C-alpha cells in the first residue's frame, strides 16, 4: 500500500490539473461528481447491485456507497460528501481512514435529500457529472454532463497515471490466481458452475465485485462470445474450456481470457498457434502504431491459421478481403482497459471527442486510437466455429473455400480466445498478465 500511497499524490495532482484546464476552457466554476444512487427492481423492495460512477471512482476507491458526491475545481482541496445514514436495516459504510483521505475535505451526509446543504451556493455555474439527471435538475444544475467536459476527460482517461497502472497490475495479479484455480478445476472434472465458484474463491471477490460477468464455457459453449449461462452438469465428454474472467482492485479492472484442450489433439495445436500469434501481435505494439492496423494484422494471422489447419483454401489476403476470416474471428482485437472493462476514449481522436469510427469491414473493433505511452489495452485474438456466421459463407461462392469436414471436427470444441492486458510504455510493452504468472 505504501507504493500506492506514493503514486496517489501525483494521481490527484494530475486529476486536478485536468479539471482546472477544462474548467478554464469552458468557463465553469467546478465539477460536482455524483457516485450514483440505488436502482430498485421493478415491483420489488430490493435494489440492483450498486456500481459507482466511473468519473467518481477515478478520484478515490469508494466503490460501494451510493449518494456520495465530489466537489472539485482543480485548485482547492477536493471535497468528499460521504453518505453515512442512520440505518439499522443495512450496514453503513465506515468513515474512510485510508491513505487517500488526506487529500480530501470529508463531510458526512446523513440524509441523501439534504445534499444541497453541502454543495456550492453558485450551483448554476457548476457542472454535474453523473447518471441521475433528474436529481441534478432538482438541485439546480443547468450544466449536466456537458459534452466538452466529458470528451476531454474521456480522452485523457486513456493515459493512465502510475497509481492507475499499479492498481491494474494488482487487478491482474488477483485474476491470475483465479485463472490458475479455474484451470485446475477444469482438468479435475468440474462443471461450469463449479469452475466459477473455484474462480471466485481464488480471487476473493463475489459475482458483484468482479468487473464483469465471467465467461466459463465448456466445449461448444465456447463458440458463444458472451456466454454466461453456467451449466451445473458436467458434459458427458470433456473437450475444451474457455474462461474470460477478470478481477477488480480499487475500482480498476483486469480482463483475461484463456482456452484449454482437455487432451493433446488438433484443437490443442490450434491453441498453441493462436498463443504464438497473440504474442507476436503484442510485440507489434508501440507508440505511434494505429490499433486498427494491429487488428488487420490479426486477420492476416487468422487467415494463415485457416490455411495451416485445413479450415480454408486460397491465400491470406483473399481470405481477409472476402470476409472469410471475419466469420471465424468476428470481434475486435481488443479495447482500452481501466476503470471500465471497455474503457472510454477508444474512438477519441482528440480532446474535443472527434470520433474515429471502426473500419466498415470491422464494425466491432472497440479501439481506433494511435497507441501512446501509458495506455492499457487488451489483446484478444480468437478463432471460433460459429454456425450462424459460417452459414452465411454457404450462401455464396465463399463456402467453396471452406473445408466443412474440418469445421465439423472442430465444432464440438467451440472456439479459442487468448487475452492479455498490456501497458504501452515509451520503449517497451509490459504484458501484465504474463508477467504476473499466467504464462499459458
Curated annotation (Swiss-Prot):
The enzyme's E.C. designation: 3.4.13.9
Listed HAMAP family: X_Pro_dipeptid (MF_01279)
Alphabetized GO MF terms: aminopeptidase activity; metal ion binding; metalloexopeptidase activity; phosphoric triester hydrolase activity; proline dipeptidase activity
Entry-linked InterPro entries: Creatin/AminoP/Spt16_N (IPR029149), Creatinase/aminopeptidase-like (IPR036005), PepQ_N (IPR048819), Pept_M24 (IPR000994), Peptidase_M24B_aminopep-P_CS (IPR001131), X-Pro_dipept-like (IPR052433), X_Pro_dipept (IPR022846)
Domain of life of the native organism: Bacteria
Catalytic activity: Xaa-L-Pro dipeptide + H2O = an L-alpha-amino acid + L-proline
Keywords, in A-Z order: Dipeptidase, Hydrolase, Manganese, Metal-binding, Metalloprotease, Protease
PROSITE patterns xrefs: PROLINE_PEPTIDASE
Gene Ontology cellular-component annotations: cytosol
The protein's name in its UniProt record: Xaa-Pro dipeptidase
Amino acids binding Mn(2+) 1: 255, 335, 380, 419
Textual note on the cofactor: Binds 2 manganese ions per subunit.
Keyword Cell inner membrane: no
GO biological process, one term: proteolysis
Pfam families, per the entry: PepQ_N, Peptidase_M24
Alphabetical list of Gene3D superfamilies matching this protein: Creatinase/methionine aminopeptidase superfamily, Creatinase/prolidase N-terminal domain
Residues at which Mn(2+) 2 binds: 244, 255, 419
CDD domains per record: Prolidase
PANTHER family with a match to the protein in the record: XAA-PRO AMINOPEPTIDASE 3, XAA-PRO DIPEPTIDASE
Family label: Belongs to the peptidase M24B family. Bacterial-type prolidase subfamily.
Cofactors (names): Mn(2+)
Job description of the protein: Splits dipeptides with a prolyl residue in the C-terminal position.
Amino acid at each position: 500500500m505504501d507504493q500506492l500511497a506514493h503514486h496517489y499524490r501525483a494521481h490527484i495532482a494530475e486529476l486536478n490539473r485536468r479539471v482546472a484546464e477544462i474548467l478554464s476552457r469552458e468557463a465553469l466554476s467546478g465539477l460536482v461528481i455524483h457516485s450514483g444512487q440505488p436502482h430498485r427492481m421493478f415491483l420489488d423492495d430490493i435494489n440492483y447491485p450498486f456500481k459507482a460512477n466511473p468519473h467518481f471512482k477515478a478520484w478515490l476507491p469508494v466503490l460501494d456507497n451510493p449518494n456520495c458526491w465530489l466537489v472539485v475545481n482543480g485548485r482547492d482541496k477536493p471535497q468528499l460528501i460521504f453518505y453515512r445514514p442512520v440505518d439499522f436495516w443495512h450496514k453503513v459504510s465506515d468513515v474512510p481512514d485510508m491513505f487517500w483521505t488526506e487529500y480530501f475535505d470529508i463531510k458526512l451526509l446523513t440524509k441523501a435529500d439534504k445534499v444541497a446543504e453541502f454543495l456550492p451556493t453558485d450551483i448554476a455555474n457548476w457542472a454535474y457529472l453523473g447518471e441521475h439527471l433528474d436529481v441534478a435538475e432538482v438541485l439546480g444544475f443547468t450544466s449536466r454532463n456537458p459534452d466538452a467536459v466529458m470528451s476531454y476527460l474521456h480522452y485523457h482517461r486513456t493515459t493512465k497515471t502510475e497509481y492507475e497502472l499499479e492498481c491494474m497490475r494488482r487487478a491482474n495479479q488477483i485474476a491470475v490466481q483465479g485463472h490458475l484455480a479455474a484451470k485446475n478445476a477444469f482438468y479435475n472434472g468440474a462443471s461450469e458452475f463449479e469452475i466459477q465458484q473455484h474462480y471466485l474463491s481464488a480471487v476473493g471477490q463475489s459475482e458483484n465485485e468482479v468487473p464483469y460477468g465471467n465467461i466459463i464455457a465448456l466445449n461448444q459453449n465456447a463458440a458463444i462470445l458472451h456466454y454466461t449461462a453456467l451449466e451445473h452438469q458436467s458434459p458427458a465428454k470433456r473437450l475444451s474450456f474457455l474462461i474470460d474472467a477478470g478481477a477488480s482492485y480499487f475500482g480498476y479492472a483486469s480482463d483475461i481470457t484463456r482456452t484449454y484442450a482437455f487432451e493433446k489433439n488438433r484443437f490443442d495445436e490450434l491453441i498453441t498457434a493462436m498463443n504464438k500469434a497473440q504474442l507476436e501481435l503484442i510485440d507489434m505494439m508501440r507508440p505511434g502504431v494505429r490499433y486498427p492496423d494491429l487488428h488487420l494484422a490479426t486477420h492476416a494471422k487468422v487467415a494463415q491459421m485457416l490455411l495451416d489447419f485445413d479450415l480454408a483454401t486460397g491465400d491470406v489476403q483473399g481470405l481477409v478481403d472476402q470476409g472469410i476470416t471475419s466469420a471465424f474471428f468476428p470481434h475486435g482485437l481488443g479495447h482500452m482497459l481501466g476503470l471500465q472493462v471497455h474503457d472510454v476514449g477508444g474512438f477519441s481522436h482528440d480532446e474535443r471527442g472527434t470520433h474515429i469510427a471502426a473500419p466498415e469491414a470491422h464494425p466491432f473493433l472497440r479501439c481506433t486510437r494511435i497507441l501512446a505511452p501509458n495506455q492499457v489495452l487488451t489483446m484478444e485474438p480468437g478463432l471460433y466455429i460459429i454456425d450462424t456466421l459460417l452459414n452465411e459463407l454457404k450462401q455464396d461462392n465463399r463456402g467453396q473455400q471452406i473445408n466443412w469436414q474440418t469445421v465439423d471436427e472442430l465444432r464440438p470444441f467451440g472456439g479459442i480466445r487468448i487475452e492479455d492486458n498490456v501497458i504501452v510504455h515509451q520503449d517497451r510493452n509490459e504484458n501484465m498478465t504474463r508477467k504476473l504468472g499466467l504464462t499459458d
